[in-house]
Amino acid sequence: MSQYRTFAAADAVEYARQFGGVDNPNSLVDALEVGDGNLNLVFRIFDTAGVSRVIVKQALPWVRCVGESWPLTLDRARLEAEVLIEHGKFCPQHTVNILHYDPLLAVTVMEDLSDHAIWRADLVKGIDWPQAAGQLGDYLAQTLFHTSDFFQHPHQKKADVIRFTNPELCDITEELFFNEPYEVHARNAYPRALEPLAESLREDHELRVAVAGLKHRFYSNAEALLHGDVHSGSIFVAEGSLKVIDAEFGFYGPIGFDIGSALGNLLISYCAAPGLLPPREAADAREKRLNDVRQLWQSFAEGFLALAAEKSRDRALAVPGYASTFLAKIWRDSVGYSGTELIRRTVGMSQVADIKGIQDDAMRVECVRQAITLGRSLILLADHVADIDALIARIRQNG
């Protein structure tokens, strides 16, 4: 790791000239640092015409918003690149194309998606991409099926579980999803007016037991190679296109975690809409988010079952009916994990633009209250929400 150095813009340009795959490398002349996350530098590389041509991303050895007191492994750059390369084998149409990565410098070069929009940014503005949820469901079906026991040879699967072991970033997930929102913690960031509600989460024994079960399955169930951080801020959308990026939290874990994270993000948008948009537009946006929830699950479920029927390699798992049984288990997990996503994004430190963008303080409090209440309900009732219709009915009942 002695070769590691933090890139400046000029370093990113020079690196892109070497590994960006452009026809005329010397045409790359400028870089703009555009990263808005806490873990990485992200440079957009421009040519002489001012056109963005390629992305150079470098992992930082610490969390940006905290500093050197929160160090992080640089191996996550390798993990992210290899997860995306692996996912790209099975779903290239919805996975960002990795052009090159260097584990010693913790640098990845990838395709530029400047012709796409970040899905979350458009959701906040009330812009709808009706195809996106179905495309995301397809991505999840393809990547999670093909890296599961249904398809992988058991020897390869066991080797890949080791190859993609990601303890440091999993530790962050475990803290932010399953521990800190249910404790008095300095990193929690909910509105002061909701202290009684936050306290009720800490004191709800039934809820804490359910969260413990979700955390235990996150620890123990190496079902498929997860993206590990599926949310609308790590998804780019354009007409007819969806691309998933930012897989540094990837590891072998429970399939329902990726599905639930995606569903939970759509539900955050659902809860936030009244604070971001005029009443009529907000009501319309909420209906569209419920349709997205339906489309995402149906696309995933139909895709997974079709792949299982056609491509299962394990003789026992290929027995007719087993894939449906397994899918029912994924469904229960997905509902529960969607609840933890809602709570960690509103009680915990990982606040998102959907909530932060609400200008009216009282409205923000009410939107956060609704998200927390819905999250709690989904965690507690995950085993009793029979299907997608029941889930949508439960969401409507929450308000």
UniProtKB/Swiss-Prot annotation:
It catalyses: 5-(methylsulfanyl)-D-ribose + ATP = 5-(methylsulfanyl)-alpha-D-ribose 1-phosphate + ADP + H(+). The keyword Nucleotide-binding applies. GO terms for biological process: L-methionine salvage from methylthioadenosine. Substrate binds at D229, R344. One of its GO terms (molecular function) is ATP binding. Pathway: Amino-acid biosynthesis; L-methionine biosynthesis via salvage pathway; S-methyl-5-thio-alpha-D-ribose 1-phosphate from S-methyl-5'-thioadenosine (hydrolase route): step 2/2. Its EC number is 2.7.1.100. ATP binds at N40, K57, E111, D112, L113, D246, A247, E248. Keywords: Amino-acid biosynthesis, ATP-binding, Kinase, Methionine biosynthesis, Nucleotide-binding, Transferase. The keyword Mitochondrion does not apply. Catalyzes the phosphorylation of methylthioribose into methylthioribose-1-phosphate. Belongs to the methylthioribose kinase family. NCBIfam families: MTRK. Homodimer. This is Methylthioribose kinase.
